[in-house]
């Protein structure tokens, strides 16, 4: 997909190198959080990695069955990445309910009472 632009809700394969510490690494599936309008204009996109190692952490979002990808979205590991140089490839699309649940967990994490 040479003209592919990642869009919110897409499941993509992306190179997560380099990484450090507890961050997810390697070529792996990730969920796109940002809309294609932003991604196309800026050349960056917001991603959350997907893991098959479900551990019951409070910020995991379980991916429903019936999709190509399985496991959980790590909503507390948001990354802004240059999707063009990281060999981003479309793989699947998650239902809107999954994106909504991911955003709810992010809102909880980022809550600010200033």
What kind of region is each of these model predictions?
Residues 1-114:
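Conserved functional hotspots at enzyme active or ligand-binding sites that engage polyanionic ligands
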């Amino acid at each position: 997909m040479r003209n592919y632009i990642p869009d919110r809700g897409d499941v993509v394969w992306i190179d997560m190198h380099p990484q450090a510490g507890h961050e997810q690494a390697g070529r792996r599936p990730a969920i796109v959080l940002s809309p294609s309008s932003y991604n196309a204009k800026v050349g960056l996109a917001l991603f959350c990695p997907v893991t098959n190692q479900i551990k019951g952490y409070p910020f995991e979002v379980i991916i429903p069955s019936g999709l190509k990808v399985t496991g959980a979205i790590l909503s507390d590991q948001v990354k802004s990445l240059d999707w063009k140089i990281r060999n981003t490839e479309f793989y699947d699309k998650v239902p809107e309910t999954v994106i909504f649940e991911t955003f709810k967990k992010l809102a909880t994490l980022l809550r600010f009472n200033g």
